[in-house]
């Protein structure tokens, strides 16, 4: 395992793609290389850069340049109509008599990275417990939520959500990860896997990472613990920091001016908790 580390603009994605090239030069087929990004935007960027650099490849040949959820989706043979959409969550909210925190229209969006945003804390708690793979009572007891949150209503909604998905044969993004882990024998194998933006992976995605370790000879992680912006939604930056690996540090940023970086370093130095140090 190798970790490519560095602040914004130091070329982490560029470095990963350079490593991709080194494997291609060894004669490794492109379909034996998995390049997974945390966000759809990052996956698309990597694919575009590869095609620009290697015009001999068509988009269809870069089928494993995608998000982790897209990889699960295609590996498991799922279809779009199998996946929970915002209107499904809103329908469930109406059926369960769940209102938004501000009494406006209930809005729920599940991003392609598996994190859910909602103006109802009830849905937020359920999703966060799911991506952290812990009981909802444990998440409820973190005291990170409003005192108005009623545990019995929360538990009732959790049951309703499970029944709703079962009745309508639907799964959410976290279900995809769990299904992949359970049905790992369906997974293709690789010579090398790259995971970009790894600091934002959730505990359930790290469980998927542990499975991927058994499906490949080499694996590269890229990220920056100082850029972990999804801890509020359940990201496990501690696992990223503590994952044993050979560390490669990138220091020169071409995106962030020196004065901005210096000010940022002052702020970052005040943040408590474990950090990756050179």
Set out the residue ranges of the language-model regions.
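A basic- and aromatic-enriched beta-loop-alpha substructure that forms the phosphate/nucleotide-
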Residues: 71-118, 122
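Conserved helicase motor core of SF1/SF2 NTP-dependent helicases
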Residues: 7-18, 38-41, 199-278
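P-loop NTPase Walker
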Residues: 1-82
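Short, well-ordered alpha-helices that flank and scaffold nucleotide-derived cofactor binding pockets
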Residues: 18-25, 48-52, 178-185, 207-214
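Accessory N-terminal region flanking or inserted into the helicase ATPase core
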Residues: 1-6, 14-15, 32, 103-194, ...
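The start of beta-strands in P-loop NTPase/AAA+ ATPase cores
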Residues: 62, 191-192, 219
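Conserved SAM-binding loop
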Residues: 35, 194, 221
């Amino acid at each position: 395992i190798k970790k490519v580390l560095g602040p914004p603009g130091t070329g982490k994605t560029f470095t990963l793609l350079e490593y991709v090239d080194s494997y291609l030069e060894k004669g490794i087929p492109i379909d034996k290389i998995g390049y997974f990004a945390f966000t759809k935007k990052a996956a698309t960027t990597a694919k575009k850069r590869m095609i620009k650099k290697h015009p001999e490849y068509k988009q269809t040949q870069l089928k494993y340049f995608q998000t982790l959820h897209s990889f699960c989706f295609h590996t498991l043979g799922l279809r779009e109509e199998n996946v929970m959409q915002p209107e499904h969550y809103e329908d469930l909210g109406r059926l369960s008599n769940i209102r938004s925190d501000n009494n406006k229209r209930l809005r729920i969006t599940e991003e392609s990275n598996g994190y859910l945003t909602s103006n109802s804390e009830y849905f937020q708690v359920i999703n966060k417990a799911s991506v952290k793979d812990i009981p909802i009572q444990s998440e409820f007891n973190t005291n990170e939520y409003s005192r108005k949150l009623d545990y019995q209503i929360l538990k009732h909604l959790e049951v309703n959500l499970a029944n709703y998905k079962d009745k309508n044969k639907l799964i959410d993004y976290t279900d995809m990860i769990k299904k992949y882990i359970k049905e790992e024998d369906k997974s293709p194998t690789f010579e090398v896997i790259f995971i970009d933006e790894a600091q934002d992976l959730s505990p359930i995605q790290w469980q998927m990472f542990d499975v991927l370790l058994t499906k490949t000879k080499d694996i590269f992680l890229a990220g920056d613990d100082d850029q972990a912006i999804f801890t509020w939604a359940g990201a496990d930056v501690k696992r990223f920091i503590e994952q044993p690996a050979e560390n490669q540090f990138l220091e020169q940023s071409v995106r962030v001016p020196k004065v901005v970086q210096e000010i940022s370093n002052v702020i970052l130095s005040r943040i408590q908790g474990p950090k990756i140090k050179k």
